């Protein structure tokens, strides 16, 4: 409702085929705020947060030159939207999550040093230390993930899956940080007023969870499902051969997957880096899960677990990347990477147990 220039996506139809494109489909056009017929006065109220949002109404006559890219780009709006989302969701919401987590970490750090209970500072209490540990752990991961993803975007890439990982992981981890910070700040955090530095971030956390793709949808369908669709070298050729009833092609692709799995298994024995070994094990596990084909869309708990493993691997790499380029604490870096890998091993065991894959018991620990 506050925008002066609006990008409008709509389903373009051309019954008389004036554009010689048949039925063009999703198209994106730019319209100005004061365009005749545009009603732009509806304000939603997302949790009383400063998040301007509202619906657009009206019966508009949009010139064809307002289509982004002109007449030639009629019907290519879906590609535009996906490319924009691939970059955009990796910037705005992760940055917001990063900021709120840093404010909470900084504020709570000083609070537990100064606040005393039972004649001792809060920082000396193990229960507080446990919660603050989670705050630092997740804040560091968010900062590292945002930093590496920004560098990827600055290089001109549009990583759809990586941006989905960073959006989902950063907003979820920021909510964890804020929950722990609220617990430590206790009564001060639930009373509105100028001294409450957490309330506005806590209130806004569900917005980041929801917008630009619900985290539930992103985790269960997008991260692993779309990542598999974009990256696996053999499995979809295998599924196509089944649909085409092509026995020769099926045998060829199945042999490639089998050879790839054996190669990864043998390669894992020669790796001394634990993170690299877990990456190889995940790639091998993916070969087995991918054989489910379209059933992955229905088995969303399995897809979600695989997404968590994939996300943790990316975040572990980002923590090492951040340490390398910023000369940060090696002790903290090793702790976070080890903890992410431990979480992953539990998830890998869970996937193997639920699928009943006895043939890859060597990965089970």
Region annotations inferred by a language model:
Residues 1-38:
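A short core secondary-structure module
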Residues 36-61:
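Flexible, small-/acidic-enriched active-site or ligand-binding loops
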Residues 55-89, 106-123, 265-270, 280-297:
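A glycine-rich, basic-preceded beta-loop-alpha segment at the flavin cofactor/substrate interface
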Residues 109-110, 127-154, 172, 179-182, ...:
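Loop-to-helix element that buttresses phosphate recognition and phosphoryl-transfer chemistry
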Residues 114-130, 324-329:
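Terminal amphipathic helices with adjacent charged low-complexity linkers/tails
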Residues 157-189, 331-344:
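Charged, glycine-rich active-site and insertion segments that engage polyanionic ligands
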Residues 189-270, 356-365:
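Glycine-rich phosphate/cofactor-binding loops in nucleotide/flavin-utilizing enzymes
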Residues 254-365:
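C-terminal amphipathic alpha-helical interaction region
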């Amino acid at each position: 409702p506050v925008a002066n220039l609006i990008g409008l996506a709509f389903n373009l139809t051309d019954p008389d085929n004036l554009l010689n494109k048949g039925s063009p489909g999703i198209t994106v056009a730019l319209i100005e705020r004061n365009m005749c017929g545009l009603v732009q006065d509806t304000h939603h109220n997302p949790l009383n947060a400063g998040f301007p949002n509202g619906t657009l109404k009206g019966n508009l006559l949009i010139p064809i030159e307002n289509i982004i890219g002109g007449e030639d780009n009629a019907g290519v709006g879906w590609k535009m939207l996906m490319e924009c989302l691939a970059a955009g969701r990796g910037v705005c919401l992760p940055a917001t999550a990063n900021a709120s987590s840093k404010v909470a970490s900084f504020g709570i750090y000083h609070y537990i040093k100064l606040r005393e209970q039972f004649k001792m500072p809060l920082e000396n209490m193990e229960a507080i230390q446990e919660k603050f540990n989670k705050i630092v752990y997740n804040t560091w991961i968010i900062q590292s993930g945002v930093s590496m993803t920004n560098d990827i975007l600055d290089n001109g890439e549009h990583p759809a899956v990586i941006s989905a990982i960073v959006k989902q992981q950063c907003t979820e981890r920021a909510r964890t940080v804020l929950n722990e910070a609220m617990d430590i700040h206790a009564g001060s955090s639930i009373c509105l007023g100028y001294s409450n530095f957490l309330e506005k971030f806590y209130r806004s956390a569900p917005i980041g969870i929801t917008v630009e793709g619900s985290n539930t949808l992103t985790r269960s369908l997008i991260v692993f499902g779309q990542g598999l669709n974009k990256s696996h070298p053999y499995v979809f050729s295998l599924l196509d051969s089944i649909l085409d009833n092509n026995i020769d092609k099926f045998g060829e692709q199945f042999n490639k997957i089998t050879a790839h799995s054996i190669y990864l298994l043998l390669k894992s024995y020669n790796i001394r880096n634990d993170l690299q070994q877990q990456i190889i094990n995940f790639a091998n596990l993916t070969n087995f899960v991918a054989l489910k084909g379209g059933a992955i869309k229905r088995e969303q708990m399995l897809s979600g677990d695989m997404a968590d493993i994939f996300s943790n691997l990316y975040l572990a790499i980002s923590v090492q990347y951040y340490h390398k380029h910023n000369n940060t604490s090696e002790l903290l870096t090793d702790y976070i990477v080890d903890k992410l890998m431990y979480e992953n091993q539990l998830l890998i065991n869970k996937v193997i147990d639920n699928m009943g894959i006895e043939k890859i018991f060597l990965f089970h620990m």
